[in-house]
Design a protein with these regions (language model features):
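C-terminal accessory extensions appended to soluble enzyme cores
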Residues: 99-201
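Conserved AdoMet/S-adenosylmethionine-binding subsite of the radical SAM
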Residues: 1-108, 112
């Protein structure tokens, strides 16, 4: 997120610091293993869709080689009393997103993603709106399948996540290996069943 100028996230390290940390993690883990989350997108009297897209562009240009995916959400202030109270207490006049605004933002974000050559996979976190026409998919805020792919050999973590790592079956008479359609292959002839049922919000 980039709300440094507005001071909306007090106690959070500076944007420059967070970007450098992100790049460092990406170098160690690989750019497919580190996901950029801009969560949530907030509208106020001083933050418009144009402003949000400028913020996204600034970060995206810096992270284009450090990640493959951007996950975002729209701030639903009315559903979170504490957030609503904090904004009002700090005299921050917020605006709620409606479907028209969400659609406009999604369209322009997808256009920016293509125009600037980022080619990020775009996904929402905990949103009901369907904006797949812009190539934006529903996503979990925390991707359990990605965690499993990165740490499948950590038996304690897999037990906590209730993920069963299974051995690939032997080939059939015709050389085919049959696994469930929602199975995800792992190294060492292992696989697991995806827990990633599309997030409907």
């Amino acid at each position: 997120n980039d709300y440094d100028d507005e001071g909306l996230e007090k106690g959070v390290k500076s944007l420059d610091y967070r970007i450098e940390t992100f790049k460092m993690l990406s170098e160690r883990l690989g750019n497919e293993s580190v996901i950029w989350r801009f969560d949530p997108m907030i509208l106020t009297d001083t933050i418009s869709i144009d402003d949000l897209l400028r913020k996204v562009q600034n970060i995206g240009d810096q992270l284009k080689d450090s990640t493959k995916k951007l996950v975002f959400s729209y701030a639903d202030i009315a559903s979170y009393r504490k957030v609503k109270s904090n904004l009002e207490k700090n005299n921050i006049p917020y605006h709620e997103w409606n479907e028209e605004l969400m659609d406009e933002f999604a369209r322009r974000l997808a256009e920016m993603n293509k125009a600037r050559g980022w080619d990020f996979r775009l996904a929402t976190c905990g949103e009901k709106i369907n904006i797949s026409k812009y190539g934006i998919e529903h996503n979990r805020c925390i991707d359990g399948d990605l965690i499993t792919q990165l740490a499948w050999n950590d038996s304690e973590l897999m037990e906590f996540m209730k993920v069963k790592i299974q051995n690939m079956p032997a080939p059939s008479l015709f050389g085919d290996i049959e696994i469930p359609s929602d199975a995800i292959k792992l190294p060492n002839n292992k696989y697991f069943i995806s827990s990633h049922k599309k997030d409907n919000g």
